[in-house]
Amino acid sequence: GWADPYSNAIPRMLSGLTCPRKGLIGPWAHEYPQRALPGPQIGFVQACLRWWDYWLKETDTGIMDEPMLRAWMPDSIAPSTHYEECPGRWVAEEKWPPKNNESQTWYLNRNGLNQNAETDKPMLFPTSQTVGLNAGVWFPMGAAGEFPGDQRSADSGSLCFTSEYFYDGMEILGNPEATVMLSADQTEGLLAARLCDIAPD
């Protein structure tokens, strides 16, 4: 699911494999979809049986007539370290990557995040090793306290780039990529990029 650290593997495998394949991404943490949190859960065992019956028993279950990818498109929700349910809806793509795929490039500028590169002048920033303590558990199973909470504490110790408000909404299905040029005055470092939905309040 989207709360699982391996969520990027699904679109990557759908793109890279040439064998018959199906992808399923729900709102879940690293747990079986019939019992995973956050909900909604699905009949995962029944879906698996339809796949196995088709390929192992040559029973026409209709599974291969269905879209290549089914994914949960989450709605905006207030930050919390635990959710019982994630509001949203199921979406489907016949092929992956989809034919109507639209890629956008956004630039990290001094005045925020936008679609025009404004300067290549470096931005200097002293970092703190405590940034990220509230990032949640890397391998969540859906237990209380495992998900990332309010990110304002991490923002206070980070370089932040905020876009204008998306009045028409913005939906992302897939795995965003970040390309950054940087230098450091230390021999080792760690770069973390966060893509956050900012609440209006």
Which sequence ranges carry the predicted segments?
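Catalytic histidine-centered segment of alpha/beta-hydrolase-like enzymes
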Residues: 30-41
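C-terminal, loop-rich substrate-recognition/catalytic regions characterized by aromatic stacking residues
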Residues: 39-201
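Extracytoplasmic/periplasmic substrate-binding proteins
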Residues: 13-17
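Acidic beta-to-alpha connecting loop that harbors the catalytic carboxylate
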Residues: 2-3, 28
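Catalytic histidine neighborhood in serine/cysteine hydrolases
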Residues: 18-32
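Active-site phosphate/pyrophosphate- and oxyanion-stabilizing loops and adjacent acidic/basic residues
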Residues: 11-12, 50
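Conserved alpha/beta-hydrolase "acid-adjacent" motif
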Residues: 3-10
